[in-house]
Amino acid sequence: SAASLADMVAGTRRGLLLTCLWYIREVDPETLLLTGLTRDGVYLVENGEVVAEVDHNFRFNHSPLDIVRQATEVGATERTLPREWKDWFTRVAMPPMRVPELNMSSVSPSR
């Protein structure tokens, strides 16, 4: 069976846990390049434990196809919560993924 998110965190030596992606926009429809931001949900993981909230948001520029190709682990599919409570239509089911080389293009303070 697929790993839970907790199992995946427990198996992480050092990394970032991203729990919310926001303001996702299309950059190049031919390659499906998207840009977006992390928001209110970036955590530092060290030695299998979430040790701190990261006080920054990050911008990414990636194709979801490339992200799936780069994933080294995919966990059990879970129903996600909407960013805003009134956004009931944006609920989806998605698995957590480990993507070791996911690069962020810029950083900004989260507050």
For each predicted feature, which ranges?
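Dual-mode signal for accessory low-complexity, basic/Gly-rich regions
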Residues: 1-111
